[in-house]
Amino acid sequence: LDAHTKVDVRAELQELLAGLEIPTLLVTHDFEDAAALADQVGVIVEGRLRQTGTPVDLVAHPADPFVASFTGANLLHGQPDGAEANTTRVRLEDGTVISTTDHGEGAVTLAVYPWDVTISRTRPDDSATNVISGAITAVTELGNRARVTIGPLSAEITVDSLRRLGLEHGQQAFASFKATGTRIVASKGGTP
């Protein structure tokens, strides 16, 4: 379906399902549809049930990288590189060090959601402890919001912010996010 029709159909389905008092099974490949229409979501991979829960639970506690990616997360890969206070430092494959409030051992995969990432033209001076700098590799306008990609991270910002910051493909920029905005979703040394 085109984007406009999809929104209309989703709204009609929400209304229809709200009036039913029977369990209903919906099948979709779109997490936004699942989140909008379902009380409970089951993620099936290669014929096996990978995780079930509310849409909020799946985003807050994805069972593995596939579920995190399905729910919209950016995935970062690295190795734990020490700890301080209540955070673990993770050295990414490119050498960048990220802080997370989660703990893991061995090779880890971190999930960072686009709505937790802030984009700026200058190095941020705020409470976001994690900063990745680089050239903007993609800018995609999605109606009233835009997706901006820097290195391994995509951020979702308003189109007003995109215009105000003057962000364009190829420009140098900074993507920042808090340690609390990361989740370890895979750990070679055991369950995160």
State what each model feature region is.
Residues T52-D81, A85-T87:
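ABC transporter nucleotide-binding domain
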Residues R48, N74, G143:
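Residue-level detector of flexible, active-site-proximal loop/helix-junction positions
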Residues L17, P62, F70-T71, V112, ...:
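Hydrophobic aliphatic residues
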Residues L1-A63:
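ABC ATPase nucleotide-binding domains
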Residues E32, R50, V56-V59, A68, ...:
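Nucleotide phosphate-binding site architecture
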Residues H77-P192:
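Non-catalytic connector elements of ABC transporters
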